[in-house]
Regions:
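Glycine-rich cofactor phosphate-binding loops and adjacent beta1-alpha1 units
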Residues: 184-263
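Mid-domain Rossmann-like dinucleotide-binding core that forms the NAD(H)/NADP(H) cofactor-binding site
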Residues: 116-195, 199
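C-terminal substrate-binding/catalytic core of Rossmann-like NAD(P)-dependent dehydrogenases/reductases
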Residues: 250-304, 315
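C-terminal capping/lid region of NAD(P)-dependent oxidoreductase domains
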Residues: 207, 237, 244, 248, ...
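A structural motif shared across PLP-dependent enzymes of the aminotransferase-like
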Residues: 41, 93-105
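Glycine-rich beta-strand-centered segment in the early N-terminal region that forms part
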Residues: 22-39, 51-95
Length: 343
């Protein structure tokens, strides 16, 4: 059966390709027709540009990007018990492709009734800031600074508010993203390029600095800023991947003397199903995501700037990878990519 995919054959080149692929199922497998697929700009562009500390830097090209999708089951193996044909699901780490095969308990999760498939496609991506917020262990009334307002940062700000943080302060260089963050419930939105940025953050937190910080940019200058303004004995969680990570920081001044907790929150540290020692798995985070989404407390539809055809892959990645003001969120629409898949 044919399958369409997007991949990077070389640096700064994206290709949409259709080729024959084996769709034979093992007894415990399902075939998922992908409906929508959200581009994760930070991770995907790091590989697109062949930056350090990426999969491409280790395994080289070709690279197959994409990890957060929604779809529906069109074929099941003889031993599958959990799903039936027609069930809506989200899949993790499936790549940008028209269909995927999954074992019924392997990073696949049912979509509840009442959830739009476009919103559901963000489930796996949204679980990353959920991991960061869980690890921060925010207490009611603690201030939280979110540095960076891309997709992850905009979701992290909403989750910090849900967790009880006040005030929620966000920062981003883009005026449009700062305004969107305010619309989504942030209390303050600051420009990190302003010369008095650190002083403003401290002023907004009664002179103490925020007790909790989510660093989403992966930028070394942003990391330095948050270490300067975080409160004594505060917690800083590193959510954004620091691709160029060998620049020095004054550990004695900004971490040791201030008693700061520096917390890693890479998704690879979280189990898919069995709760971690601090009590949550990837599946738990999906469940929470859908609860918050259905209740209206978490919003992701306003993060989507454009719904695009996968056939336009090269133009899409040129737009987000080469533009000075790239779109925030691009959702790939696979519903018209048929590949002779049974319906």
């Amino acid at each position: 059966m044919n399958r369409s995919i997007i991949y990077f054959p070389e640096k700064e080149k994206a290709v949409f390709e259709t080729a024959e692929a084996d769709a034979t199922l093992a007894p415990n497998q399902v075939l998922v027709k992908i409906d929508y697929d959200l581009i994760s700009a930070g991770t995907e562009l790091a590989n697109y540009h062949d930056l350090p500390n990426t999969e491409v830097s280790i395994r080289k090209f070709p690279h197959y990007p994409g990890y957060t999708t929604s779809g529906h089951i069109v074929k099941i193996g003889d031993a599958v018990k959990k799903y039936k044909i027609g069930d809506r699901v989200v899949c993790a780490w499936g790549g940008h492709r028209s269909w995927v095969i999954r074992e019924e308990n392997d990073r696949i999760y049912p979509v509840p009734e009442g959830i739009d498939q476009k919103d559901a496609a963000a489930a796996h991506l949204a679980s990353f800031p959920m991991l960061a917020i869980r690890k921060l262990q925010i207490q009611m009334g603690e201030a939280c600074l979110i540095a960076g307002q891309g997709l992850l940062g905009l979701i992290a700000g909403q989750l910090a508010r849900i967790a009880g943080a006040y005030p929620v302060i966000v920062s981003d260089c883009s005026p449009e993203r700062r305004e969107l963050a305010l619309q989504l419930g942030a209390d303050y939105a600051l420009d990190p390029m302003a010369p008095d940025y650190v002083e403003k953050v401290i002023q907004l937190t009664d002179g103490r600095g925020p007790e909790t910080v989510v660093e989403v940019t992966g930028n070394i200058q942003a990391r330095q800023q948050v270490l300067e303004c975080v409160a004594k004995n505060g917690r800083v969680v590193l959510l954004g991947c620091t691709r160029i990570s060998d620049q020095p920081i004054n550990v004695y001044k900004y971490i040791h003397c201030k008693g700061v907790y520096l917390i890693g929150a890479h998704t690879s540290n979280r189990p898919a199903h069995d709760p971690a020692h601090w009590g949550a798995s990837e599946a738990d985070d999906y469940k929470s995501f859908f609860k918050y989404l259905k209740s209206g407390r978490l919003k992701v539809s306003s993060l989507i700037s454009e719904v695009a055809s996968p056939r336009e892959a090269d133009a899409i990645y040129q737009k987000i990878g080469m533009s000075a003001n790239p779109p925030l969120g691009i959702l790939l629409n696979w519903t018209d990519i048929d590949n002779d898949i049974p319906r």
